[in-house]
């Protein structure tokens, strides 16, 4: 198994699909990486030479992925909460952020129903 960005990439899969195992790399970015490195999208990871895998590593290192991306996302959410803006308040209360209705739906975000006390 090749190790790129701290993740074991599956050997049996095509390069484009295998790169999506890295958090922060989707299909579009994986295709862009393959185009930039001149590696065929349909080539399987086990068929690549060590030099090609090193080139892939260098190309992936140009992007913010995995732990750094997760940290950046959580810091952005924390910043919104500290600012006290509307989105920050919605995050703090664990409610939907983007204008969805909450009178009847939003159970996933709000959690299980709480019984009404009498």
Swiss-Prot record:
Molecular function as annotated in GO: rRNA binding; structural constituent of ribosome; tRNA binding
Keyword Nucleus attributed: no
Region (Disordered): 94-118
Alphabetic keyword roster: Ribonucleoprotein, Ribosomal protein, RNA-binding, rRNA-binding, tRNA-binding
Physiological role: Located at the top of the head of the 30S subunit, it contacts several helices of the 16S rRNA. In the 70S ribosome it contacts the 23S rRNA (bridge B1a) and protein L5 of the 50S subunit (bridge B1b), connecting the 2 subunits; these bridges are implicated in subunit movement. Contacts the tRNAs in the A and P-sites.
NCBIfam families attached to this UniProt entry: uS13_bact
Assembly with partners or alone: Part of the 30S ribosomal subunit. Forms a loose heterodimer with protein S19. Forms two bridges to the 50S subunit in the 70S ribosome.
Entry protein name: Small ribosomal subunit protein uS13
Gene: rpsM
